[in-house]
């Protein structure tokens, strides 16, 4: 028997390609309404949060492709692993978290964050680009540095479909013309951690433990090695300091990992995490 639909016969390869083509759906998302001044952004595999200069990490179960930002306000507390997809995996405290920046002016550090939400620096945010597969946000910090000659720091985090990391483009403008400026990138210290740095590869990272509710986590920052100046480790955070010129963007990547987010973790070591950072540099 034949089904006479009246349609011309379709080429078999074109037919299978059409059926196998991935559905055109959003694979990145953002939200800034659930808990101002928080901004969240994500792919199906990784999610990040920014508030007043701090960079935070969410851990996702890697065998589940999901976007959490559109309905994050409707979920239970993400500080506990109770929503199925994962949880917030980092206690940032009064630090850069994973990827916050520090502006150095004539050698003096000025963390680009605001612990109280009052005074300087002030922060604004906006969406620069959004498609189903690519997202770029922008956070502008004004009033950074010396009170009489402040700078403006512009951060543009981006993420693409399937990405396990977020790139961040940082640009500094303003200040006194004769001032020497440098840009530091911070990584919060964990109470129990193995820290790793490789100036030639352009990587700092850690594998460690902060909270029994969270378990073991990994963090990494990948920076342009040609910009490297020095490490500036502080009691609460590790820092890498980069050469910075006004108006010239510096792009670095931030990435996190959550041991419980892997279906078959196989007891990875700190070296396994560092190898991943180097391999995916």
Regions found by a protein language model. Give the residues of each.
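Beta-strand-rich recognition/accessory modules
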Residues: 221-281
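Extended, loop-rich substrate-binding clefts of extracytoplasmic carbohydrate-active enzymes
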Residues: 83-160
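Solvent-exposed N-terminal domain segments of exported/luminal and surface proteins
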Residues: 1-116
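Accessory, usually C-terminal, subdomains that scaffold auxiliary metal cofactors
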Residues: 189-238
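A short, structured loop/turn motif at beta-sheet edges
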Residues: 126-133, 161-163, 173-180, 243-249
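Short acidic-hydrophobic surface loop/beta-edge motif
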Residues: 39-43, 139, 206
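Residue-level recognition of well-ordered beta-strand positions that form the cores
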Residues: 138-140, 156-158, 169-171, 186, ...
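Acidic (Asp/Glu-rich), glycine- and aromatic
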Residues: 153, 164-198
């Amino acid at each position: 028997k034949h089904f006479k639909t009246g349609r011309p016969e379709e080429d078999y390869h074109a037919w299978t390609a059409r059926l196998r083509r991935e559905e055109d759906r959003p694979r990145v998302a953002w939200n800034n309404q659930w808990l101002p001044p928080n901004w969240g952004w994500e792919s199906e595999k990784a999610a990040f949060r920014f508030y007043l200069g701090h960079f935070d990490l969410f851990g996702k179960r890697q065998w589940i492709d999901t976007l959490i930002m559109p309905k994050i306000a409707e979920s239970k507390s993400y500080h506990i692993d109770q929503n199925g997809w994962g949880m917030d995996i980092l206690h940032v405290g009064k630090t850069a978290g994973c990827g916050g920046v520090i502006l150095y002016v004539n050698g003096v550090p000025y963390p680009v964050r605001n612990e109280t939400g009052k005074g300087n620096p002030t922060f604004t945010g906006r969406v620069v680009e959004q498609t189903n597969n690519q997202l770029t946000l922008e956070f502008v910090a004004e009033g950074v540095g010396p009170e009489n000659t402040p700078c403006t720091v512009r951060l543009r985090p981006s993420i693409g479909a399937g990405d396990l990391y977020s790139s961040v483009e940082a640009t500094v403008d303003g200040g006194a013309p004769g001032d020497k400026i440098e840009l530091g990138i911070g990584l919060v210290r964990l109470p129990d951690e193995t820290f790793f740095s490789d100036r030639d590869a352009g990587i700092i990272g850690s594998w460690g433990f902060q909270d029994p509710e969270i378990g073991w986590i990994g963090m990494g920052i990948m920076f342009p090695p040609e910009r490297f100046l020095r490490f500036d480790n502080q009691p609460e955070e590790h820092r890498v300091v980069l050469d910075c010129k006004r108006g010239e963007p510096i792009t670095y990547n931030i990435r996190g990992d959550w041991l419980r987010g892997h279906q078959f973790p196989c007891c990875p070591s700190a070296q396994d995490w560092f190898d991943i950072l180097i391999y995916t540099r």
